[in-house]
């Protein structure tokens, strides 16, 4: 089985619902050792109110105690926290932050391997330690290291959409798009496609900022002055990227099938078409960090909380994606650490005399 997976959520939204529905499938605990960071009491409340399938939760004090083939939970949230389904409350935000902080601490010391987060509410989680627009920015600070930037990738099957600008007002987008930033995002994207998705020579499509890709400068100069130079600059650094493509035609005629990744300039440009294609089972992956973190591509959904109608498909896919990426990273590390060994095994080992995998001094 694969190492521990950590999960946390907003207590008034659909977080516990999608987690419990996903983990009620006993096969999941055979793939990994799930550790929920939250409250067993609140989980039990959600299960009862929503009449969810029974999940036996094994309460543990620390991640190291997690038992295989069972669903573990670490109580890091005050049991007395009041659950008010469908409401955004400060208590819910506090609970979400405590769970996130506990899990991040365990990730940092290697007690858990991957992080799958259920949706948080961006408003109620804000406090003195957490003043970020969302998970991605918080995790970037925790795991980005020196100058390491996170990249948000929305994925479903072979469609992977990444963003140059994320959670900022639309009015600021044009001024925030620079050659340097596009090149940096292309390099992170390229590296992620190689190590996290096992693609040897990734092909990345770059979307234009303006309608009709700027129409030769009639509808804006960003393509000629910023995006095209960025594509050329990235090529010198070993990134195969193409474009800029006008976004409407690009998605309309399914050109995206020909690429391993799509780099959009701003949030809605990339996410509107993505969610049209993958609303129920899309996954949000935070690339560029030292740890693996995924989440469902949907929000807290207060409007349907407590009705047992939320689909857990996106959360299940987020869990599978985290496990796949974790395994791919291990394979990538092994392949790049010792390329000879990989070649040797790939070609089969019937000639025992010539063993390239032996160290000189063995």
Name these PLM-found stretches.
Residues 1:
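Glycine-rich phosphate-binding loop
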Residues 126-151:
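Glycine/threonine-rich beta-strand-loop-alpha-helix active-site module
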Residues 74-76, 153, 164, 294:
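Hydrophobic residues at beta-strand termini and immediately following loops
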Residues 154-184:
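Ligand-binding beta-strand-loop-alpha-helix segment within the catalytic cores
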Residues 4-135, 176, 180-265, 269-275, ...:
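Contiguous, glycine/small-aliphatic-enriched amphipathic segments in soluble metabolic enzymes
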Residues 50-51, 143-147, 168, 197:
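A broad structural signal for alpha-helix termini and local helix breaks/kinks
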Residues 142-159, 289-303:
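Short, flexible loop segments at boundaries between secondary-structure elements
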